[in-house]
Amino acid sequence: MKTDVIINRDALCALRELPDESVHCCVTSPPYYALRDYGLDAQIGREDTPEQYIDRLVAVFHELKRVLRPDGTFWLNIADTYCGTGSKGGYTDPKNPKGRNGQSLSLNRRAPNCKQKDLIGIPWLLAFALRADGWYLRSDIIWQKENPMPESCKDRPSRCYEHIFLLAKSKQYFYDAAAIAEPIAPTTAARYRQGRAAGHKYAEEVPGQGKVQGINKARKGGYYDDALIPTMRNRRDIWLINTVPYKGGHFAAFPPKLAETCILAGCPKGGIVIDPFFGSGTTGKAAKDLDRHYIGIEINIEYCALARARIGGEST
């Protein structure tokens, strides 16, 4: 199987041609529902109902599950959509701030069982559908942005986050927690030095106290040896990562740091990362920069050209 390649095809058709259990990790962000018209007959995101949109994505990711190794992980970036009037409203696709230019279809679709102005709940509808299809739903990571697109709404808070779902094919899967660990807070280190325990004011002689979160070995005479105080902690599930500008013609690119974090945790060095909605190639570039291989699938030939210019690689 070729790697470091960009495949110009529909995601489902291209995945069907890949061998079983051949890739280590998937990092992807499919087109969001009813927010942009890419002008392609087979595009995902322009379905008449949210249910049809969910069904199409589940079919794509069902095929992805076959292609993933048993220890593979799937990192899915998705955002929500508001139910509208069926006309072109004022809501902007968070991945496509300039995506309204030249639109030919309504961008705010009506949805069955939803009232006008309802938040449809696309991320969780998709997550539950994938879980029902056999995926292990392991984490809902909040991607928080300090520089979100401004919104003109006056009757709700402006949105500043998207979801990243971590899913796995099996109960046991590759996850390198150390690769994305984050520094402990200075106040936490200070508490360790003072001998304070989690949930207690002091570490010494607290009735019923056992080990202080597994680090009692570091304590000497009621205090902690600096050399043994932990400096890192497990990555939390709120990731503060700002969007970054991209000079190419594809406005849906998510930040490289986002893709890099997922790849570091979910794919071993030398492994293969796949993105069935490759766009301008952010996932592929991140994989290449981190000494992993990539397979990109993209239906839009113009985006394939952007990705090839950005990261190199073979196109088919």
What are these model-predicted stretches?
Residues 1-316:
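Core catalytic lobe of class I
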